Structure formats: C-alpha cells, structure tokens
C-alpha cells in the first residue's frame, strides 16, 4: 500500500483577464461520490486535457475521469500569455536558442507535433480564430543588445532552414503604433490562443466522452490492491492508472522534490478601448503579439473583439517557496506594468488596468521535464519549462502513450532526456534564483 497526502493545493493569485472575458461553455460538475475508472487524469490544464484526449483516442472503450482542483480556465493554464511557439523558447537563458542546429530542429519538431495535436483539437471542438489563431509572433527589440539577440536568433533559425523576417523600426511602428521598438524578428509558426477559452472549449469538447470534475482537489493519492484511490473532500476516484498533469505541483504529490523551480510571472490587462480611429492610431493593428528579444523582458499582446481592444502585458518574475503571492507584491507588479505600458503607449495612459494576476511557471535547471512513470501505474507529465501551451501539451500526449504502451518515434525522442537537476536547498535557492532573476532583469533594461 502506497499512501500520499498532497502537501499543498493550487492558489489563484488575482483574477486573470483572460478568464474574466471568457465564457464558460458547459456546466460545472463536482466530484461528490465514489467513482471507478480505468484511467484518472489529475489536472485539467494543457497536459491533462491533452492526455485525456489522447487516451480517448487510444482506449475509446475504457472509462476516463479528469479532475481539477479549481474551475477550468481559472488556474495556471488560463493565466499565460497564449503563445504556442514552434521555435526554441528557453527561458533559462536570455537567448531563446542556445543549442546547435540539430538540437534546434529536434525541439521544433516536438513543438510542431504538439501544435498539430492542438490544431486538430481546435478544429474538432469548433474553436474560433479568436481562440486559436495561427498568426505568428514577433520578437521585439528596444535596445541595441536586443537587436543583437534577434540577429543571433535569426542566425540560429537560418542554420536550421527556418523562415523568419526582420522588421525595422518603421515596420514595428506600423504594427504596434509605438515608436518604442528599434526592430523585430517575425516567425510565422506560432499560434496565438485565448488561453482561458482554449482550455474551456477543449474540456467542453471532451465532456461528452469522459467525466470531468472541477473544484474537486485531490487531497491524497493512495495505492491499494493494484488500484489508485484519489480522495477529494466530497468524493473519490479509484483507477488502474493515473496521469498527473499538475506541473510544479508534482512535488506536492511527493515526486521530484528539490529539483523544480517555482517561478511566478505577473501580468495585467487593460480595460477595453475603442478599436477604431483612436485604437489604431495609438496601438496599431487590431491584433499583434510581441515577445521580448531578451527573455526577461515584457511580453505584450493586443487583442480586439467586437470593436473593443485590450492590451495584455506580462513582465517581472519572482521565485517563491509559497503558492500564494501577497497583495503588496501584486500591487508593486501592477505599478511595474503601468510603467512599461506607458513607456510604449503614452497615449493609453488614461486607460487603466482592469485585471492584474500572477501565474506559476515550473522550470528545471537543465531544462528537462518532470516526466515518466514515477510509481507503478502513476505517470508524471509535469514541468513545462516556461512554455506550458506547447511543452505541457506534448508531455500529456507522451504520458498517455507511455501509460498505454504505445510506441512511436516521438515518444522515443521525448524519453531521451535526463532527470531535472537538483537545485540548492532553501534558503539558498530563494536567494540565488531571485538574485539571478534580478540581474537578468537589469540586463534586459528597456526590453522589460
């Protein structure tokens, strides 16, 4: 008998703007009884949803249950900036791609495999262009160093035979309405999603074939007589096999302890403003998406729906030992967002932020996922390393394949990675990681 009490449960830090403007497409159902299943997936984010879809395809006659601690769309998966990126995106360094041409090709092949899976789901579940938009993204540079980083990234893409386009300052102004940027690097393969709508519509598409229980936190996970029992306050699920799609919370389930870095990213969304003459004159085209040339800079998106535009900005990171962020920290980050936005779009100074929030990333020192069969019949699809939209989608698919004994070249390549490296013990990890973050943010300068 294996017994495990879940140490901590997820916490929602602020209301995500993406969730606030999202609409729920199916009724919420809580776990309030004892349920038996062949498969249990814990976590209804990118990994869990993808694992459930893959399991349904591989084992259509078997019962699959998906549970989440909160309401789908309100958790971490509905709080990111909505970039499904096909090209390298390594947040552990200031340069997105630090590997050679072959490593770049392998990473892009994996990313595109995941994006193709997501595209099939989007089509099957009737997602609109506003929810799933293959529009590409631009790495924006506001400094000479940023321009050099873009040039280096462009060389990496060229060596791998990848399409890309450099934009000058005037072209960036035409795109964004801002004279802040010196140039940009456009890559066409990124898909832009409305993250809260994406996970909600994905879940809605699955809901007629699998049982989905929300607001049903798993407080303990016990193995007895060859089956796993997941207990929740008002019910339980027993299943032969379990897939954990809980990202950084995997260490709260007793696995990969001392190996994962829990990074908080902070974001704000403006109130809506008219998308007509005013909106276009001060913020360019109706929809665009910018990543910073330096990974520690500001990620910015403009979205427009029904004649109303909004800008979403994400910048600043902290490493935390707790799952909750204090009000003082949230208020300070909102002020940082205001300064960054005003520097780029001074004409929007009177447009306030409607929502500010934080979301957790999970990174490992060696950029390796927390993946594999961690106990008999218990599989981990965790640690997205800063690109959960794609990496967690991929991990969920691969976990389903591994758990069902399905062989594929993709799984063989994915399994060819080390375990996440150990991080220093606390408080040294907190001091060291936050120190590195601060230094990298200072170096990013106007990119932030």
Task: Report each predicted region and the residues it spans.
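Dinucleotide-binding Rossmann-like beta1-alpha1 core, especially the glycine-rich loop
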Residues: 87-169
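Extreme N-terminal leader/targeting segments of oxidoreductases
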Residues: 1-39, 57-58, 62
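Active-site substrate-recognition segment that forms the wall
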Residues: 116, 124-132, 218-220, 236-276, ...
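Helical element adjacent to the flavin cofactor pocket in flavoenzyme catalytic cores
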Residues: 155, 180-240
């Amino acid at each position: 008998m294996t017994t495990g009490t879940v140490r901590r449960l997820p916490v929602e830090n602020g209301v995500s703007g993406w969730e606030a403007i999202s609409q729920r497409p199916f009724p919420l159902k809580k776990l309030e009884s004892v349920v038996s299943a062949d498969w249990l997936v814990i976590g209804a984010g990118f990994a869990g949803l993808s694992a459930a879809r893959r399991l349904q395809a591989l084992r259509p006659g078997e019962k699959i249950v998906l549970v989440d601690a909160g309401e789908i769309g309100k958790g971490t998966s509905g709080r990111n900036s909505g970039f499904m990126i096909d090209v390298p995106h390594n947040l552990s360094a200031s340069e997105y791609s630090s590997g050679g041409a072959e490593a770049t090709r392998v990473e892009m092949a994996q990313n595109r495999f995941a994006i193709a899976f997501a595209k099939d789901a989007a089509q099957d579940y009737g997602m609109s262009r506003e929810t799933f938009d293959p529009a590409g993204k631009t790495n924006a540079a506001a400094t000479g160093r940023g321009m050099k980083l873009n040039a280096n990234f462009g060389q990496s893409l060229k060596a791998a035979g990848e399409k890309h386009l450099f934009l000058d300052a005037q072209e960036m102004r035409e795109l964004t309405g801002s004279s802040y940027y010196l140039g940009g690097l456009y890559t066409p393969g990124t898909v832009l999603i409305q993250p809260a709508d994406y996970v909600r519509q994905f879940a809605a598409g699955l809901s007629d074939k699998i049982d989905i229980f929300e607001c049903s936190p798993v407080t303990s996970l016990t193995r007895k007589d060859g089956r796993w029992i997941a207990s929740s306050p008002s019910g339980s699920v027993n299943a032969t096999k379990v897939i954990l799609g809980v990202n950084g919370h995997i260490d709260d389930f007793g696995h990969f302890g001392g190996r994962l870095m829990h990074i908080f990213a902070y974001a704000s969304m403006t109130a809506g403003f008219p998308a007509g003459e005013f909106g276009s004159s001060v913020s360019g085209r109706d929809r665009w998406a910018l990543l910073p040339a330096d990974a520690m800079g500001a990620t910015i998106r403009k979205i427009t729906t029904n004649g109303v535009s909004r800008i979403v900005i994400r910048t600043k990171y902290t490493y935390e030992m707790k799952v909750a962020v204090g009000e003082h920290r949230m208020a300070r980050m909102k002020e940082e967002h205001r300064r960054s936005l005003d520097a780029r779009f001074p004409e929007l100074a009177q447009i306030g932020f409607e929502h500010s929030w934080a979301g957790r990333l999970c990174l490992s020192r060696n950029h390796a996922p927390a993946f594999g069969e961690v106990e008999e019949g218990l599989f981990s699809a965790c640690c997205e390393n800063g690109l959960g939209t794609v990496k967690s989608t991929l991990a969920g698919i691969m976990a389903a394949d591994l758990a069902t004994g399905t062989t594929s070249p993709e799984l063989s390549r994915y399994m060819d990675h080390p375990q996440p490296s150990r991080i220093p013990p606390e408080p040294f990890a907190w001091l060291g990681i936050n120190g590195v973050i601060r230094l990298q943010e200072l170096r990013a300068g106007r990119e932030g």
